[in-house]
């Protein structure tokens, strides 16, 4: 049983006038002042329609909803209704809000509730926004809400709600699939009349979802400000979450906190010095867990007592922990144990660069010729000669090419070498600068002097042999005295 007196509240019911309204509705409607209207004096408790019509004619509070042209019409005579009616609920659909609203619309002459087809055609994303040009008008409060302040529409939501036919200005709208839509989650009706969804509340009510001061609604500037739990996490928060998962701050040495089972990676332990500078921040890796052998004291003491010989790379060989079988245990082998395998020799130190005797200024990569090193080879395939200096190689190449750049001015003879031209000119001038030390004979070329000196050496050798035969050699007589 439902009485009309139950619909009385702090806000008056708004009636949508269909006659005399402006032909071009304004899309930028100003919200009504959020203050309580004066008490309707002289009307019964349930006669809200008469009070609304009289207020519209007086132009006191409902001027935006009426928008009448010309003088205000005479208020009709008061309409009162008192009584009660019963609604027989169908077992499948108990307390159907649409049926009740259609009945109330027929009695009060209000706009009927939109049908199921129109409600189904709306997207679930539009469930948070009312449809129609009068969406900016405040709706009735939740009659059965324990907190009347939480049941009212928030001011910031209706101030920034999009008008009819305009797309949503929110930057982010949550996508709700069909199973996620709650049965009691409905859009506010197109008519500003009674919303029966608030009278028969479901598991969730739109007034509860749009509570006052909700940060998830559109602000007055038109930008969306998501709730703290609905916002995307910042990049810093994501990095901190990843670091907290992959790099825990502390790694205690207990058995329950080990990342792997015992014996999985124990074949390659590291010495404290091999871990570098970060070994101080890893106490759990160097300290043996309690109850696993050894004392649970400092990790350095434990490793100093149990760590075997390390290779140059700082890793222990995989066979160090495995027990080596004795030779006597192997069938068919002698009882003589094998000699111990010597540890691997460390890497030899790099040899320092050998410096020259005088500490020459040339480095090891210098291309200067070394003594007795012939770095310049003849490029001719049939010639195998090589030279220590580049000018000698150039002089040698003139033999293969036949080039003779030096010419005698007297006889116009050409020579491939300058020293040959010099000795040739001495033949014309008669100059003999080289003299023999024994006989004093003079020569124009140095090689001729050397050849002549060999003659004197042979003569000396023959004279000594002759003296030996005569016996004068022992007396000390010289060859010149004979």
Swiss-Prot record:
Q: Where is the composition biased (Pro residues)?
A: 337-349
Q: Where is the composition biased (Gly residues)?
A: 291-302
Location (main, coarse): nucleus
Renumbered zinc finger spans (C2H2-type): 376-400, 406-428, 434-456
Q: Which Pfam families match?
A: zf-C2H2
Q: What residues form the membrane-spanning segments?
A: none
Task: Please report any disulfide bonds recorded for this protein chain, giving both cysteine positions.
Answer: none
- What name goes with this protein? Early growth response protein 4
Q: Which gene encodes it?
A: EGR4
Q: Name one GO molecular function term.
A: DNA-binding transcription factor activity, RNA polymerase II-specific
Gene3D superfamilies assigned to the protein according to its UniProt record, in alphabetical order: Classic Zinc Finger
